[in-house]
Amino acid sequence: MNHKKTSIIILTYNKLEYTQACIESIRKYTPRGTYQLIVVDNLSTDGTRDWLAEQTDILTIFNEENVGFPKGCNQGMELSTGDSILLLNNDVVVTENWLKLMNDCLYSSDEIGAVGPVTNSAYGDQEIAVSYSTLDEMWDFANTYNLTAEPDWERRLKLIGFCMLIKKEAVDQVGLLDEAFTPGMCEDSDYSFRLLKSGFELILCRNVFIHHFGSTSFGEMPEQRQRLWNRNREKFEEKWGFHTSYHAQPREDLVQLMNEQDRYKKMNILDIGCACGATLLNVKYKYPNAELFGIEKNEHAASIAGLIGNVTIGDGETISYEAEAYDYIILGDILQQMKDPWKFLARVKESLKPNGTILASIPNATHYSVIFSLMKSKSLYGKNEMLDHDTLRLFSLSEVQRLFVQSGFDEIGYKMINNEVSTLEQRFIDQLSSLVGSNDNTHLTAVKYLIRATRSKNSYSSLEILLEQINRGIDVNETVLEMTSMLKDGSINSSMIISTVNTLEIDRQLVLNILANQFFIHGLYNDIIPLLNASLEINSKHYDTLYNYASLLHSIGADREALMYLNQIEEKDHESGHLLEKVLNNLI
């Protein structure tokens, strides 16, 4: 039986009716003797102080100024005598078994430092969908939800401060809340990461529900709330080196694309651009036997993710990958940031096991907000939720599908994530659809596409076979004709050819130069230069490549550039000497 005592700390600033409801629910649903109740009042003026002064079971601190949330909590924490400390908003009503269930989780392991419940209203992913519309219905919902026999605990990166239960020994080790975040916001994220860096785990008790009215302090002042959020977010980024929202939010939408039949299978999961590891934690919650791997270029975020799995600091586009190592690879909104997503996907594909799967999220370039911004000559970045400053390229749905086909994936499925639109926005969308003569405008409201693409069971693709044939001199003309046809219909491109050539045990420069010559004959001029550049990366003094480059440049009248390549040929023969003579004559 758990005999631990909890110090419950509540801050108040007006809103007496919420405070009364909160404290009455604590008295009703929490056994006497198991808790200490501390209230810190930040100079309320609505009768709250008078009411608190009348309560005999509450230890109250009456501040003579509004010191804000972090400092007020710290005042209460310094007075606490419990084995654990619970930071609780006054706009909360607690429910049957709430504290017992959270304590059961908190003390189930020495590694756990703090726990929190789910609720109906929270700025983050502790919010769940509820089926009630009145408080009376809420009690019935909570009594059914808070089941003592079914623990459902999920390890998390951060907990929201509306209800956070912390071991006293963790507080002693980590310290108090950072008052730099006064009057409030981001202090709970900061404290969560401090707990993590000190070696403690954070757990979300999914089997505990309490009701949260939500933001009574700032809810009536949305502009002030936004200013505070922006200011404290900047403070958080300056302190930690990453964005609390972007780097700590799990991509549950991508994890949901995994095969539920794999729930207890031993698997290797790689998250490229894993940030602080929130998505990897969500994978572990749903697939407990999964081995977790990540790649993250932000070293500060990677240091957090490294507490969760095997994380490498680096750029996912340039890092090397182990062949056939992973069952799933997660790409959350990173393909649009790649310099060469075709080459990247072709490389990553080789790191998948046969039948391995890519789970990707890609912003939709044809979203109505992007089109509207273009028409209004507004910036596409910043406030626009579609794009950020790291975006290098845009993808429509057809381009997304072609990207995966060209990279050698099959069984490519997609799901649209749509946003709600206003009446005015819908009118704009309808006008766009009418303009292009389309009855289907779903792509205009799709914020992003979720992609599930499986590597072909036959890892030896048709392109690899064609390149092998060219290397061996087998039906070269027919093979090149087939490849030119594939280039023209968009099923392959030069980046895919180069990345595939680099994976094969062939004479790479021979094959690249044969293709360059044949593409010239077939008029595929845009695909020649990338092939010749790729060949020079292998050997910058390669005779055939230098000669073919010079010949191509001479044919389009770029003789000065052609001369540069001819001069790099160390031993000229009759053919290169003749070309040099023609180039020099043109330059006279």
Regions found by a protein language model. Give the residues of each.
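Conserved donor NDP-sugar-binding/catalytic core segment of glycosyltransferases
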Residues: E96-S131, N364
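Short aromatic/hydrophobic "clamp" motif used to bind/position activated sugar donors
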Residues: I85
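A recurrent flexible, glycine/aromatic-enriched loop bordering the glycosyltransferase active site
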Residues: P70, Q126, T134-E137, F141-E169, ...
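A conserved acidic beta->alpha catalytic loop
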Residues: D41-D50, E65, C274-G277
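Glycine-rich, basic loop-to-helix element that forms the pyrophosphate-binding segment
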Residues: N63-S80
